[in-house]
Amino acid sequence: MSGRTLLLSPPSLSSQPERLNGILQSYDRKTTDLQMLDRLILGVVNLPDAAYSRIIILAGEEDSISESSKLTTRETFSHIARSLQKGGYICSQHEQQGQAFDHNEAVLVGLIPTDNGKFVKPDIEDMRAVPLRLGRKKHDKTISSNLAEPVRNHQASPTVAQDQAEDGFRYSSGRNIVTASAHETSDNEIIDEEDLLDGSELAAPIIQPPECRPKAGRRRRACKDCTCGLAQKLEEEDAMRRHAADKQLGAMKLSHGDLAEVDFTVQGKVGSCGNCSLGDAFRCEGCPFIGLPAFQPGEEIRLLNDDIQL
């Protein structure tokens, strides 16, 4: 079969360029691609669908395929199988069946094993459904007809048929076969949920269950599916507390007199990187001098009328 070839190499083989080049020389470089298994697992590389006629998993150190077998997980192997063309196959470098990947994983993704250790992707379009005609014995047909005889001869009484017809069931004439329509509904069966409770019931106070009542020394907690109103009440209390805390911890406003002089170069106040004086490009994320221009170490910085003066 003519087509492109994909070589999947374990990461240990990348440290042996001479051996890797020797393997590549045995394949046509114009129609051969090389990918690393670890990059495929991490999602750095995405293989195109139905692009290769054969995929070969290379051996690692000392011609061992155990490393490749550990890296080919179910998700990775499924992605590799999707990149095969119909009729293409996947195998190990030495065509040793069962060493480069698991048999079960190959079968689960739809590949068919062969005698030479290759797993072939079948051409589903060539497969057709074949009807199976199962013959029945004449004796069984006779028994079935005899069993159905009393049922056909049995007639439903008119009273029963009339009563059950009023319940929404229909009977075929002359037989006791019930055919009920699941889609037939009456308008009377639809109940408006707004009519279930009247005004007096809605105005009645909610009785709190004993398990929802607060215990001494503990904060009340609502049930997971609370219906007594405790969960809504606790949410309102928490919202009020957060609003009060945000109001107290509002943004601090400085007057014009408070901005007379601020020295940012206090001795001992430096960032963890030690590059605070070089500018924001060299400062770490938590540096106290972020936003200030570059300055000389020990230089005094003043803020007058919101303007930085060195």
From Swiss-Prot:
Biological processes per GO annotation: iron-sulfur cluster assembly
Motif (Cx2C motif 2): 284-287
Region span, N-terminal SAM-like domain: 1-130
Keyword GTP-binding: no
Matching Pfam families: CIAPIN1, DRE2_N
Binding site for [4Fe-4S] cluster: 273, 276, 284, 287
Principal localisation: cytoplasm
Transmembrane region(s): none
Subunit structure: Monomer. Interacts with tah18. Interacts with mia40.
The protein's name in its UniProt record: Fe-S cluster assembly protein dre2
